[in-house]
Structure formats: structure tokens, C-alpha cells
């Protein structure tokens, strides 16, 4: 359902393997290389434990992440840029979630 809504809204989605870390830190280049070597596509810190708890309680889960920094790029990540990238994605994500909720409750 979310894929169809994203297509209708011209929102590009990517699919991949999410690597969960404890955070809150920027991972090292060595960690990013390791995560890539074991098949990881994206790294984050909160989705995994929240999903485990929700599934343990029998709650269905829909996960979506915004990639806010590229760990293996030449650019050094900083907190301000991560916040900016999240803010820029917020409008598209809001539209997607509003439509998803509308369709779930029709």
C-alpha cells in the first residue's frame, strides 16, 4: 500500500537491509565498511529495538527511514546537516503518512 501511495505522490522509495546500532553516535568509516560487507544498506539506532518491542506485543509494524547522511562519503557528517536533511524530507514523509492513514481507515 505504501509503495502505491509513494508512486502516486512521486516519492522515490528505496528498499534494503537496515543495520541497527545503539547510538547516538556517528559510526566510524570502519564500521560503515563492515556494515556494507555484511549486506547492510542503511544504518540507524532506533528502529530495531522499537520494532522488537512492538512485534513482541503483537503490534503490526511499518518501518520507514530517511537517510540523512552517507557514512562512506568523503564528506564528514555533522549534526546540523543531519537535522537539515531530515527536515527536507519531512514534507514528503508527512504526505505519505497522511495518505497511508487515510487508506488504512477507509
Region spans (language model):
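Glycine-rich phosphate- or other oxyanion-binding loops that anchor nucleotides, phosphorylated ligands
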Residues: 1-66, 70, 76, 80-106
Amino acid at each position: 500500500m505504501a509503495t502505491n501511495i509513494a508512486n502516486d505522490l512521486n516519492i522515490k522509495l528505496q528498499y534494503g537491509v537496515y543495520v541497527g546500532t545503539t547510538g547516538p553516535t556517528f559510526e566510524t568509516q570502519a564500521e560503515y565498511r563492515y556494515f556494507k560487507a555484511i549486506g547492510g544498506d542503511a544504518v540507524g539506532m532506533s528502529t530495531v529495538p522499537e520494532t522488537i518491542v512492538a512485534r513482541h506485543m503483537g503490534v503490526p509494524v511499518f518501518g520507514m527511514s530517511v537517510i540523512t547522511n552517507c557514512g562512506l562519503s568523503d564528506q564528514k557528517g555533522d549534526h546540523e546537516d543531519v537535522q537539515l536533511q531530515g527536515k527536507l524530507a519531512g514534507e514528503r514523509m508527512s504526505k505519505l503518512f497522511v495518505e497511508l492513514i487515510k487508506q488504512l481507515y477507509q
